[in-house]
Amino acid sequence: MKYTILQLDDHNPDVVKGRKLFEPWNILNKYSKFDISQYKKVYEGEIQEEKNLLRTLESIFEKFNLRHPSDFHGHSLSVSDVVVLDGIGYYCDSYDWINTETGKEI
């Protein structure tokens, strides 16, 4: 299964000024709104699909916190990062993942 990792562009003045880096979903949406255009692609890869979506996302999270690929140049996967699977973005929140299209927890 192909995936893409997106991280907020910390050189974008709107991101820095809005203090959006590492914000939980509910705080981000309280003061502003999720905007995919403020993200940059930092990695694309493939992973074996797990038995469910949550497990697949957790496998990617683990990989980018414990075993970074040598060609990955972003920060460890953290709150406010987005993993895209099958064209749908999943926001890494404090304790779970949020579907960026529906705003619902996975």
Q: Which functions belong to the PLM regions below?
A:
Residues 73-106:
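Short, compact, well-ordered microdomains
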Residues 1-43:
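N-terminal disorder-to-order initiation segments that are Gly/Lys/Arg-biased
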Residues 27-84:
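Short, conserved turn/kink motifs that form compact alpha/beta structural patches or helix kinks used as
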Residues 5, 15-16, 27, 36, ...:
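Weak global preference for isoleucine
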